[in-house]
């Protein structure tokens, strides 16, 4: 029996590189956003708010990252399961209402393990997802 295990987590350096990539893409599509990164335990590692981004997007982006990390899937993937009558209806009311049920949060996976997650808020759901995917593309190139 092992009494401990090593846990990989995303680094601040990687989070900063992803933030740069997201900011560049957000400027390109003219959408000011808040970009958040959490570590493997869902704890805040980085939050970056672009000029003119909605203040409310700070909590939303962080909670998207938290959700993607803790549920080990994109936030857009749980939308159907939380609708009235579905198996996870009401899930968004748990965890001190930190669970976000629309797109913009994605887990960061390395060697089959979630090592953190990203969250983007400020644009449409489609724009937020695009920018979250931009972050993952950047991470895969590091």
UniProtKB/Swiss-Prot annotation:
Classification via InterPro entries: GlcG_carb_metab_protein, PduO/GlcC-like, PduO/GlcC-like_sf
Domain of life according to the entry: Bacteria
Family: Belongs to the GlcG family.
PANTHER family: PROTEIN GLCG, SLR1406 PROTEIN
Name this protein carries in UniProt: Uncharacterized 15.0 kDa protein in dhaT-dhaS intergenic region
Organism expressing this protein natively: Citrobacter freundii
Lineage of the organism: Bacteria, Pseudomonadati, Pseudomonadota, Gammaproteobacteria, Enterobacterales
């Amino acid at each position: 029996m092992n009494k401990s295990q090593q846990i990989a987590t995303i680094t601040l350096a990687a989070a900063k590189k992803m933030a740069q990539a997201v900011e560049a893409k957000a400027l390109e599509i003219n959408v000011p956003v808040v970009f958040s990164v959490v570590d493997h335990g869902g704890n805040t590692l980085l939050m970056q708010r672009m000029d003119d981004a909605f203040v409310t997007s700070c909590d939303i982006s962080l909670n998207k990252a938290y959700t993607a990390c803790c549920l080990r899937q994109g936030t857009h993937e749980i939308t159907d399961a939380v609708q009235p009558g579905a198996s996870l209806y009401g899930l968004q009311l748990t965890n001190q209402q930190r669970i976000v049920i629309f797109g913009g949060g994605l887990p960061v996976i390395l060697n089959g393990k979630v090592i953190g997650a990203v969250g983007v808020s400020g644009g449409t759901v489609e724009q937020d997802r695009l920018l979250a995917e931009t972050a993952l593309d950047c991470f895969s190139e590091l």
